[in-house]
Amino acid sequence: MEGGAARIGGRVHRLPQGYLALVVPEETILARGTTDAAADVRCQGTIVAEAAPQDPTWSDVPGELLTFDDPQKRLPRIDRLEGFHPGALSLYQRVLLPIRGANGLRAAAWAYVEGELARRS
């Protein structure tokens, strides 16, 4: 596993349960996570992430970009840890977003954003 600093456009707020949640502009979501981790990894590999226009009403949210040598095995485990259940109400949902790395890298990366269950809280 490798890591590095990254940024995305969005907002972070605290849920009533005390957890932090990321909210992103709907139009920046490139894909949504599914139950097929291998297909999700292939999808990520085919998308060229263009720089999303920076809307002044959204913030530049710092985060950490992690890369794995075995994402097909890791994604389902991380999904469970984050409480993401594709096709069901979830506290978080996994979405593919354009990110900007510290070195100027632009890429598409999976992130966990506020899910329907959190919005109902």
Question: For each of these PLM feature ranges, what is it?
Answer:
Residues 1-121:
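Glycine-aromatic micro-motifs
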